[in-house]
């Protein structure tokens, strides 16, 4: 039995969920609307203010889809209600970031500044020059965009320079020791 899949999803006030033919789920809330095509092999039932995901058989495919489908639905409900955010931190001499309209401009030690356009449904805030906050209602888009920003300069293990998530711990290495 899937421990995650059997948990009911509670729909908070102000969030509206509609399940169409073939498990096309639309979730509307105060922050926006998300639509996702989920696996048609599972049964998604809506009762008053809860959603339940049930699987028809106990074969391996249905077991694996059970928890996944439930988590995707829960992420949609949480996203339209409260939203998701990822915080990034720039460490290094001269590493800076700033917003220019819908563009993110970063100085990361290259010969040119790195410019990134905010994708649809994602907002990036720069409270100061060394912090970035990626916000949105779709958890996958927020995570992917934060990872794209981080990929420009991953943190290196010697001094910790680069772009890292705020809660990320970098395994540090000791540098070379000179002859004595």
From Swiss-Prot:
Keyword Zinc recorded: no
One Pfam family from the record: Ribosomal_L6
Keyword list, A-Z: Ribonucleoprotein, Ribosomal protein, RNA-binding, rRNA-binding
Any one GO MF annotation of this record: structural constituent of ribosome
Gene Ontology CC: one annotated term: cytosolic large ribosomal subunit
InterPro entries: Ribosomal_uL6-like (IPR000702), Ribosomal_uL6-like_a/b-dom_sf (IPR036789), Ribosomal_uL6_a/b-dom (IPR020040), Ribosomal_uL6_bac-type (IPR019906), Ribosomal_uL6_CS (IPR002358)
GO biological process: cytoplasmic translation
Positions in coiled-coil regions: none
Subunit structure comment from the entry: Part of the 50S ribosomal subunit.
PANTHER family: 60S/50S RIBOSOMAL PROTEIN L6/L9, LARGE RIBOSOMAL SUBUNIT PROTEIN UL6M
Task of the protein: This protein binds to the 23S rRNA, and is important in its secondary structure. It is located near the subunit interface in the base of the L7/L12 stalk, and near the tRNA binding site of the peptidyltransferase center.
Family: Belongs to the universal ribosomal protein uL6 family.
NCBIfam families the record matches: L6_bact
HAMAP family (alphabetical): Ribosomal_uL6_B (MF_01365_B)
UniProt protein name: Large ribosomal subunit protein uL6
Species for this entry: Clostridioides difficile (strain 630) (Peptoclostridium difficile)
């Amino acid at each position: 039995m899937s421990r995650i899949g059997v948990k009911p999803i509670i729909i908070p006030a102000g969030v509206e969920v509609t399940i169409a033919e073939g498990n096309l789920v639309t979730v509307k809330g105060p922050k926006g609307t998300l639509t996702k095509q989920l696996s048609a092999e599972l049964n998604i039932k809506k009762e008053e203010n809860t959603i339940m995901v049930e699987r028809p058989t106990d074969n391996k495919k249905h077991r694996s889809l059970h928890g996944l489908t439930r988590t995707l639905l829960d992420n949609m409900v949480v996203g339209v209600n409260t939203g998701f955010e990822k915080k990034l931190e720039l460490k290094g001499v001269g590493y800076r970031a700033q917003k220019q309209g819908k563009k993110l401009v970063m100085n990361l030690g290259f010969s040119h500044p790195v410019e990134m356009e905010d994708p649809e449904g994602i907002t990036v805030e720069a409270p100061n020059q060394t912090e970035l906050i990626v916000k949105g209602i779709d958890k996958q888009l927020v995570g992917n965009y934060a990872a794209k920003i981080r990929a420009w300069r991953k943190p290196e293990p010697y001094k910790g320079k680069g772009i890292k998530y705020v809660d990320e711990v970098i395994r540090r290495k000791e540098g070379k020791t000179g002859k004595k």
